[in-house]
Amino acid sequence: NGKGAPKIVLFTPIAHEDLGSPNLPDGKANNSRLALYAAATREVAEAKKAEFVDLFSSSAELFRASNVPLTINGIHLNPEGNRRMAEVIARSLLEREIPASPSLEKVRKVVLDKNWHWHNRYRATDGNDVWGGRSGLKFVDGQSNKDVLWHELSMIDVMVANRDMAVWAAVGNHKHKIDDSNVPAPIGVKSNVGGKSRSSNAGKEGNLKGYNSGKEGLAKLTVPEGMEVKLFADEKMFPELVNPVQMAVDTRGRLWAAAWPTYPKWEPLKKMDDRLLILPDENRDGVADKCITFARVHNPTGFEFWNGGVLVASQPDVLFLKDTDGDDVADVRIRLLQGIGSADTHHAANAFAMGADGAFYWQS
């Protein structure tokens, strides 16, 4: 508070929740180890006269009493688990009940926005171009990946600071509009298309103005007798359908596509417009009737239908998305796996497939 020394609070780790899954440990062995850490943390707190919060015992009680899972995998809390743990922490520190307030949802919304931007700063996807072996590659006029992408990191720093102000305003229930006008402009990148650098080949790339549209491409196909080819969908019909990277047909006969317009990753100050799309052909004329955005997902390199929903890559995570109210828009979003490779986004988890053995496969 600016008047005294900061107060130190020591928290134990949470317990390991038994989710009853054959694919996950039940947590008994882990809880024996975690209990030792909890006891050691208590001893240090008592010796140093520091505040102490026993999340290990509290979470174990919550897990036993809850009729819904509070973690995604036994050790990482889901949104409901985070909410209940927050109540435990507040009660322990303030020594009174702190009921969840509707205003907290507004705070949570801006915190998640800040977190998303910060996550793309410290865990930037396509990191090989940012920090790795390709960061020093130079293109037109000696401009390198590092020159451009490190500047983008500094842009995100400012955007995160702007959202931090929004968090504090929301906590105080003050009106606040995020203003990113103070964010440095991006560095202009000169195209190397047409042989303007060693990584470009004019012979292979040709003339950008000469690329065929979907309809123009049909006229150049050789079709066997008795067969017909139609243009089902393209980005002229549906602007959302840019850079489709995987397609699949659901049990209702609808085509789904993962579209990746931000390839190779989101650029600061631009809209994150990657999507998982549904393209139904309701009158069965061989042409998509509309384009539905099921979910916005950054770097959607692969997906597969599962458990009434969809597993989809969103580097560095694999998400489970599900529509529970029938409007074809995902209202459930669960992070199932974390830490998949994202250093080179177009080589990351893709070609999702559920095997006949019940196992989930992908290539990287």
List the predicted regions and their residue ranges.
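A structural signal for well-ordered alpha-helical segments within the folded catalytic domains
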Residues: A35, A39, P79-E87, V242, ...
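The feature captures the short pre-catalytic strand/loop hairpin that immediately precedes
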Residues: E61-I72, Q363
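Extracytoplasmic/periplasmic, Sec-exported soluble proteins
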Residues: A29-L36, N73-G81, P239, P268, ...
